Amino acid sequence: MATLETGDLTIPDEILDPWLGKIKYGSAVATLSNSIPMKFGKGHSITFDIGEAEHVGEGANKSGSTVTPKTVTTAPQKFQKTVRWTQEVKWADEDHQLDVVRQILDLIQPALSRALDFGVFHGINPATGTAVTAMGTSLSDTTNSVEVGDADKPYTNLDAADVLVLADGYNPKDVALDPSFASVFGGLRNATSEQKLYPDLTYQTSPAGRLENHNSSVSNTVGAVGVGSFVSNVKAFVGDFGTIRWGIQRSLGLEMIEYGDPDGGGDLKRNNQIAFRAEVVYGWGFADLDAVAKIVDAVPAV
């Protein structure tokens, strides 16, 4: 029989690998953009703008090319989630222990997935809702902003955001929506047939849906309502999410803790409990904040 010991748990690959793949199912950022391989620690990636090709006439000299580099800095950001379980799991047989591990991973995964969004979108600690200085810039710092008007149709706001992103030379192919804004689109129907105008819009985070020729993802991480210690007023982020450089810098581990008070919930021994903790270290950076526009409702209709 397998014995759970204090410290890192050895999780079979057939359990851990699919779980790692689920990270994107709770994150709008991961749904709309691909991760890139990262080493642990601060890193830099460089993108280049080399301009257009030159026509060379017969017998003419070739001109030099101007290369404009942009450096994207990524820094490690650690998130953890701790859950408590009854102490009896230690005495169970191997099959039951693995079943418990699966349940624990299922509980932890959504929180760690959403943590990526809260960091990228707002630069906050999701446990407290407060800004994390070390995270620096967030997507909500973009100066491309569209204000929702009282009588606006939602697609006019989306169009206006597209215009801002296009003007900065990027393709506005992605949109992450707060559920309250997504439901406005979802409620629109053809006046004659009563068919939905956007049947491909889904209210889930992943896999991506489609909205007005954008890849779409819906999550309350967009507005951070109920999580942020502030009112963001953000209803959507629109733009090229491929300009977000993100990745997992450290493999996830599951640690079993038998002693002490690891989460402020009281002494484990006294409560006949053990705790399980998983950690993930993300890294992210932005090639250009102008690649994204935000739609905000700073003065909601009364």
Residue ranges and their predicted role:
Residues 54-57, 93-94, 184-187, 285-287:
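Short helix/loop capping segments that flank catalytic or ligand/cofactor-binding pockets
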Residues 49-51, 86, 178-180, 219, ...:
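Structured loops at beta-to-helix junctions and adjacent beta-edge loops in soluble globular domains
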